[in-house]
Amino acid sequence: GFFYDVLSMPDGRYIPVKVRSLVGLSTLFATLVLKKDMLDKVPDFHRRLKWFQQYREKNQQYLVIEELNDHDDILLSLVPKSRLEKLMKALLDENEFLSPGGIRSISKIHEHGYSVDIDGQEFGLDYQPAEGTSALFGGNSNWRGPVWMPMNYLLVQALQTLYEYHNDELQVELPTGSGNKANLGEVSNDLAKRLVSIFEKDTNGMRPANMDHPVYQHNEHFKDLVLFYEYFHGDNSRGVGASHQTGWTGVVAELINKLNKTEVKKMNKKKHEMVM
C-alpha cells in the first residue's frame, strides 16, 4: 500500500526504489472535500465530475474520485480508503515514521541501510536522524530521517481534511500496535501536539529543541527564548541546522492555534451537554 519512487532508465527499464520516505506519504497532501451543499449550486460541475470518474474507470486510470453519488460530499484524493489505512499503519508506527516530535522524513526501518543495483553500481541510503553524513546536499541539510515542520504541517492539514469526509467511520491505531483506536481528526491533533512539544518545557523544565544548548536551557536571560530550527532530530527532537528558520518552522504557531480551537470546541460541547 505504500508509494515508492521508480527510476526510468534510458533503455526503457523501470527500477523500483523501495525506500519508505516522506515522499510516499506526500500523496496524502492532495486531498479536498467537496461539500454537497456547494455541489448542489453547480450542477454542471457535478455532471462533469461524473464524466471524469467514468472516463478514468473506463481507461483504467488511477481514480481520484473513489465514491460519487448525488447525496453525499465528494472526496478528491490520490489515496483510496483501503490504501489510506495501510499508509496510516506505517505513518503511526513508532518503529517507522512516528517520533515524539512528529513524522520522520525517512522510516526508521532503514537504520541498517537500503541499496539498489543500477547497471553494476550500488547506490544506497540509511536512516540519519540528525545532521547529514554527506556534503552532497549542502552540508548539514538532511532529508534522510529528521522531522521537518512544513511537511508535517501539510500532513496535519491533510489528516484533518480526510477526517471531515470519513468522520468516525475510519478508525486507526494510534500508535500502531497499541490497540488504541482514533479517528483521523484525533490523529491530526496528536501530530500537532507532538510538533508543538518540540518547543515546550518537559517535566524537567527543558525544551527538546534546545537540547544541546545549556545557555538556552538554563540561563535566566535566554531560557524562555525559542529558536526556530531548520529541522529536528528524528528520535529526540533536538534542533538541527540553521537556528533562524522562522520562515517555515514558525508555522508551529498555526498548530498552537489549531489545538486551541479544538479545546474551545470541546469546552463548548461539554457546556451544551450540561445544559441539555
Question: Regions from the language model: what does each represent?
Answer:
Residues 1-276:
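Acidic, mature catalytic/reactive cores of soluble proteins
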